[in-house]
């Protein structure tokens, strides 16, 4: 076999993409608690790394194939998670027009986009921390904001990939054993 990963790992990668879409949509659009995405990155990788090998029916064979399957599915899941997360971030960053519920003080006075997001951070009491980080206006805030977003994205990909490797390792240790030579397997 000359393929880098098994067919089951490719299928698992698609399942991981679906899992990533579900997680990101749930915790950015429905219940906006972004930290949950970071917390779920490692367990998502563990699940998908194990599933990639179970789906491939990798009962026997070299460890490097088992680990490659898990890493592949973990990377695909992590990249999908980050891609969707960044798309949502771009949408909300550049489309922010300063609207705020009247019960919270009404609309923020700002120019649409980065300036409104910057003003929200200032209103939330983060001005001193931003100033210490060298952020003094919407332009410097934009650079700071996206550096932080890409650093977080790298962390999510790393955790999901590490989880994929861990899931593959767990599968390799606890995988079903191949039937003994000459034994009869009953199929129902």
Task: Show which residues each predicted segment covers.
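Alpha-helical transmembrane segments of multipass membrane proteins
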Residues: 19-23, 77-85, 89, 159, ...
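Cytoplasmic membrane-interface segments at the C-terminal ends of transmembrane helices
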Residues: 3-4, 48-70, 164-183
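Cytosolic juxtamembrane helix and N-cap/initiation of the first transmembrane helix
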Residues: 1-17, 150, 154, 160-176
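Functional transmembrane-helix hotspots
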Residues: 84-121
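Loop-to-transmembrane helix junctions at the membrane interface
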Residues: 58-88
């Amino acid at each position: 076999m000359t393929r880098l990963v098994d067919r089951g790992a490719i299928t698992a990668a698609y399942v991981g993409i679906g899992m990533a879409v579900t997680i990101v949509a749930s915790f950015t659009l429905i219940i906006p608690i972004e930290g949950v995405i970071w917390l779920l990155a490692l367990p998502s990788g563990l699940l998908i790394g194990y599933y990639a090998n179970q789906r491939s029916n990798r009962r026997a064979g070299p460890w490097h194939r088992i680990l490659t399957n898990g890493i592949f599915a973990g990377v695909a899941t992590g990249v999908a998670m980050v891609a969707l997360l960044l798309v949502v971030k771009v949408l909300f960053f550049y489309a922010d027009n300063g609207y705020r519920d009247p019960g919270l003080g009404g609309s923020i006075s700002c120019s649409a986009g980065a300036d409104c997001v910057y003003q929200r951070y200032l209103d939330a009491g983060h001005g001193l921390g931003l100033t210490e980080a060298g952020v003094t206006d919407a332009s410097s805030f934009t650079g700071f904001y996206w550096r932080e977003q890409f650093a977080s994205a790298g962390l999510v990909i790393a955790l999901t990939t590490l989880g994929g490797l861990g899931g593959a390792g767990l599968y390799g240790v606890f995988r079903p054993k191949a039937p003994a030579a000459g034994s009869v397997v009953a199929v129902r």
